[in-house]
Amino acid sequence: ARTIATMLLSDVDLKSYTDTAYHNEELKSLTRYRFDKVQERAKLKQSVSRLVTILFPELEQLVSSIHGTSIYALLSEYPGAKQISEAHLTRLANILVKTSRGHYRKDKATHIRDAARTSIGSVTPAKSLELKHTIKLIQELTSEINEIEDAIRKIMDELKPPILSIPGMGFHSAAMILAEVGDFSNFNSPD
């Protein structure tokens, strides 16, 4: 009580807790949370690269990226060169065509299966299981990141910060800067 009375008697100009301050705290929490999730996903992607190198090293030379949706779908169902080499070509082609929205065709499935048949990759059921689970975790993290980004976008749409009008300033960068700096009017000068 004494502290409150002293504070009220002193001539301190107290600012009320505004919606902007609330949104800033929310934005700060969300951008930091998103950053952590992206870092976590990056580590898992490194694990996928390591596991593919063990199980089917030739795959990286056959596709533009092993981290695409279609390759994840393929590896989720056939997590290794041995499994791919034994798969029916029509099934492989269907997975690739469907998940790549036509980017990959039957000829790509044929190339991948042929490479799998002559692969130097190890046949390791434990690593294959780890690969499947790691891909599931990446997909779940991607879903969570998208949900976080939707929440960030909602706050940014409410705030309509002028920082977004800066050429080259992306949505994520603007949100992170705004979250960490807060209200720019709190600064007397640019220095």
Language model segments and positions:
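A detector of single, family-specific signature residues
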Residues: A1-D191
